[in-house]
């Protein structure tokens, strides 16, 4: 482990020893949890100056494949290649929520306001609600990603050939299908629920205007964008898959016929952006790069500021704390970095 760096904001570096699959803070922002490809979840203070050693919990006998904060604000959910969805409480005890009949659980999301959890296993999604557990699907292909609408009334699923939108309060009703050729690999609702965005295997983004069903395609990406983020106000859509921070504007009439805002990261050699994460309350986007660099893009000021340099391994997970002052970045090699951006004086 390493302590605070000599320059820049307070930071901490911890070696977890395995691919960082996902990161999540508890609702207070005091605790950070990191799930790894070794099937373990590490818990540590989000404050990089704390210095406490991580506390490990075994969640799966194989790998953790998906991770998020749970319903209580102090618990976390992990899906694994053992087909189990596991809840880890504040007491660091792991309990099984469900076991998929076949395959592994490689997608999980939670909506605290509706007390709902959705977990993807193959072509099926298991929707856990206060009224019981419902099996949604099968979908046209294995589920690549899923997300709740901001109010939790809908669950959107990405798969080959487009997306499927389920009504969470009426899971037995026929879902809405939005079709577009190719494999859709990431999916996010805009904060105002007006748009649904996906990234595709064909190195493009696709966006539907949900009221009318009209859609638009954004092409020209260097590779497939595995990470999508909307700014807190829904005015910008940002993704990985390119060397620039490409921001598509959705204020007013949207981006049709308009070029995106492109922000150039500093440095002489272009490096692919692998992960993005939007600030919870300001027009900032955290950028993780293929060489391990971490930057912050300020869309309002149209600039990108480096936070930390290369580690030699791609950034695989990014996370802001709920108040937006602390952040964390994990890499494929298992390096976890914590930062504190609070003003010092």
Where do the PLM segments sit?
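WD40-repeat beta-propeller superdomains and closely related acidic/aromatic-rich repeat-like regions
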Residues: 1-345
